[in-house]
């Protein structure tokens, strides 16, 4: 059955980013009311102000601050009195190697990627229960199934978030709340642009990164037909799940993937340069603001 967006309240974290802004636009086009959460106030306002329809809301705050999460949900309550769809989408990653990065940066990444969606989901629960058809949707990653050596903290957060949402989904189904997670592979977003120039995980570039449209289509499918997990590229999900049957084989398998990934990485950098997203400055790529 096709999901009816009309007058549904969507709360989307990371709403100023690639996937979040695309989902917000689609929800608004179909008659939904969008509440965007993001740390970047200028970009968030630009996204929300550019949406079709009326009665949208931008709330800029730090998701790692528990008191600000509560204030944001109180604001949603005062304006809409319910949440129909909560989308946990905000995430960060770092190309810093584990043995070189600070303890503070590790804590911050775990706070944003793992703790904040769990706390937000809990704080939003009363408003979700006021909906006739409450949904919780979360952007995970194939990094929640397959370990990434260059970004182990990101892997930690996504493994944990995947497990949490599976458990929450099993529990809340009995209470009438549908929980769905989307597990995309590399997606052409500003976060991936940054990771590409900072020397992130080359395995992400074995195939050309998918578009945000491809990922948003998985969200729409899960609204129409709720599932605990959905993969924008099912073939890639099977590959990583098969590879994880015997983790001890990973050190032998990785060299087979890295060469292809490095070639794809170089190709992607050239594409970003051609699109005017990055520039080469003295042999080092930089994002063009």
PLM features per residue range, with description:
Residues 2-33:
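Canonical Rossmann dinucleotide-binding motif of NAD(H)/NADP(H)-dependent dehydrogenases/reductases
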Residues 97-98, 102-110:
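Substrate-binding pocket helix/loop in short-chain dehydrogenase/reductase
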């Amino acid at each position: 059955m096709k999901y009816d967006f009309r007058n549904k309240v969507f709360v989307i974290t990371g709403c100023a980013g690639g996937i979040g802004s695309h989902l917000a636009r689609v929800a608004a086009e179909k008659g939904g009311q969008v509440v965007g959460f993001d740390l970047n106030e200028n970009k968030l306002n630009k996204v929300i102000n550019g949406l079709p329809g009326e009665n949208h809301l931008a709330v800029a705050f730090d998701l790692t601050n528990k008191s600000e999460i509560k204030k944001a949900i109180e604001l949603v309550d005062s304006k809409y009195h319910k949440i129909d769809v909560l989308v946990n989408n905000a995430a960060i990653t770092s190309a810093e190697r584990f043995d070189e990065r600070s303890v503070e940066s590790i804590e911050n990444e775990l706070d944003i990627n793992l703790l904040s969606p769990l706390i937000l989901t809990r704080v939003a629960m009363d408003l979700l229960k006021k909906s006739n058809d409450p949904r919780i949707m979360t952007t995970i990653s194939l990094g929640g199934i397959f370990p990434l050596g260059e970004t182990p903290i990101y892997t930690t957060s996504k493994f944990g978030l995947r497990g949490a949402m599976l458990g929450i989904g099993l529990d809340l189904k009995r209470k009438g709340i549908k929980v769905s997670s989307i597990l995309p592979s590399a997606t052409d977003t500003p976060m991936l642009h940054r990771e590409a120039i900072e020397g992130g995980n080359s395995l992400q570039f074995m195939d050309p990164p998918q578009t945000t449209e491809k990922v948003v289509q998985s969200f729409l499918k899960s609204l129409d037909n709720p599932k605990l997990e959905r993969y924008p590229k099912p073939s890639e999900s099977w590959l990583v799940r098969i590879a994880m049957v015997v983790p001890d084989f990973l050190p032998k398998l990785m060299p087979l993937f890295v060469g292809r990934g490095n070639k794809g990485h170089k190709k992607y950098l050239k594409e970003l340069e051609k699109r005017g997203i990055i520039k080469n400055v003295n042999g080092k790529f930089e994002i063009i603001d």
